[in-house]
C-alpha cells in the first residue's frame, strides 16, 4: 500500500455529480456517460502496465489497480470511474482457483462439477481478509480522483459466478451449469445463496472503502429462460439490492442482467435497484415503456459501432438518445464492454457525441 494518506474520512469533495443525479432521476445538464471496461487492453498505457505484470496481480496491487482505473479518465471526459478488478475475485475468495490465460480468458483448473465438489468451497468468507486488496484500491483511487467524478464498485451476480465455477471458463454452451439447475435444484440454491452472501458482504465493504455507486453484472443471465431466471436469478439479485440498500440507501445500485430484457419490469418493480442496464438487443423506447419512471436506464450502444468512425458513431448515438425518449433518468454506456481491438478514437467520439447531442436535446 502506498505511503499516501488514504484516511477514508478525508475524501475530496465531489466536483461532477451528474452521474449520481442521473441514477437518482434528478435533472442533469447533459446525459452522463461511462463505459464498461473503459480501463482495458484497447489503451496502450494499460498494455504497458500489463507488459510486466499478470492480470490478477494488477487487480491485487492497489497502486496498479488505481493507476489503470484512472487511465481512461486522463484521456476522455467520462462522468464516472469504475474500479479496475474482476468479477472472479469472488470465487477466488471462496477458495476456488481462477487463472487468467492470455488470449483465452478465465480458466478454472478444478471446476465445481459434482455436488460433492461444493464441499471444497470456502464459506463463510471474511471479505476483509480475502478481498481487502480491492477495498484498498477503492480507497486509494477515491482519494487520487480528487473528486473529479464518482467511483463505481462492482460484483458479478450469483448466477454468473456459479456459471463460471461450474463451466470452468467462459464462452461455452453452459450445458454443465444449466443442467445443474435441472439435476440439482436444492444444491443450486445452496450454492447461489452462498455466493449471494459473499456478494452482499463484498459490496458493503466496497461502500465502506469509498465506492459511491455499485453495479451487479449478470453477464450470463441471457442463457436462462424467463422461468429459470425467475427462480435462479431474480430472487438473489433482489436480495443483494435490498440488503445493501437496507444499510446504505444513499448509494445508487445498478443491475445489468445482460440480454434478459423480459426481466426489466420485474426488476424495476422490485425496489432493489436505482438503475437497470440494457444491451443493444432491445430498443430503448421499449425498455423505457417496461420500467416507466421507476428506475433510470443505462446503455445501450452496440460496442461494434465504435469501430466505424466519428460520423457513424455520432449518428448512432443520436438514434440511441432519441429512442430513450428523454434525457432524464438516463446514463449512456455501451451494451457491453469495450473490445481489446477498439481504436482509441471510438470511445473519444462516443463520449463527445453523448455530451454534445444530449445538451442540444435538453436546451431545445
Swiss-Prot record:
Its EC number is 4.1.1.37. GO terms for molecular function: uroporphyrinogen decarboxylase activity. SUPFAM superfamilies: UROD/MetE-like. Its main location: cytoplasm. PROSITE patterns: UROD_1, UROD_2. Pathway: Porphyrin-containing compound metabolism; protoporphyrin-IX biosynthesis; coproporphyrinogen-III from 5-aminolevulinate: step 4/4. It holds the Pfam family URO-D. GO terms for cellular component: cytosol; phagocytic vesicle. Signal peptide: none annotated. It is found in: Cytoplasm. Substrate binds at residues 37-41, 55, 85-86, 164, 219, 336. This is Uroporphyrinogen decarboxylase. Catalyzes the decarboxylation of four acetate groups of uroporphyrinogen-III to yield coproporphyrinogen-III. Gene3D superfamilies: 3.20.20.210. Keywords: Cytoplasm, Decarboxylase, Heme biosynthesis, Lyase, Porphyrin biosynthesis. It is an enzyme of class 4 (lyase). It comes from Dictyostelium discoideum. Belongs to the uroporphyrinogen decarboxylase family. It catalyses: uroporphyrinogen III + 4 H(+) = coproporphyrinogen III + 4 CO2. The record marks 86 as: Transition state stabilizer. Homodimer. InterPro entries: UROD/MetE-like_sf (IPR038071), Uroporphyrinogen_deCO2ase_HemE (IPR006361), Uroporphyrinogen_deCOase (IPR000257).
